[in-house]
Amino acid sequence: MGRWYSRPVLFVQDLDRARRFYVDQVGFSEAWSHSEHGQALVAQVERSGCELILTCQWPEKAGSGLIFISLDFGDMPAVRRSFERAGVQIEDGWWGYPIMIVQDPDGNQLYFPGQSAAANGTR
């Protein structure tokens, strides 16, 4: 059986604002974008193999996304510091283990599991 692959779609109201957040503050790079009639509608951002598709095509769905992003745990303190330096608001949460929660400008949430998730075998 072949390897499965997914790219989650996050619905946003303002694609340019979302791209600035993910690229300038969260450290993603833009892989591609699609425009029609001079308006950007879809963009893909990526960082370390994590790919997200951002779209403003269905604004009524904006803010309803939740993405669980696993990092190498040794990277977590550095990632947190880089987010804080870039002005990203971080909330500490709990999902059976500590998580770091980041919310984009549209309310989509990114969950980053904490150190004890590996001990629980949930990474």
Task: Locate predicted features.
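A short linear hydrophobic-aromatic micro-motif
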Residues: 29-32, 54, 88-91
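Short acidic/glycine-enriched loop/turn segments that link adjacent beta-strands
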Residues: 37-41, 62-63, 95-98
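Vicinal oxygen chelate
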Residues: 13-16, 67-109, 114
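N-terminal beta-strand motif that seeds the catalytic metal site of vicinal oxygen chelate
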Residues: 1-19, 66-69, 116-123
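Core segments of cupin and vicinal oxygen chelate
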Residues: 2, 9-51
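Short, charged/polar, Gly/Pro-enriched secondary-structure boundary elements
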Residues: 49-53, 107-110
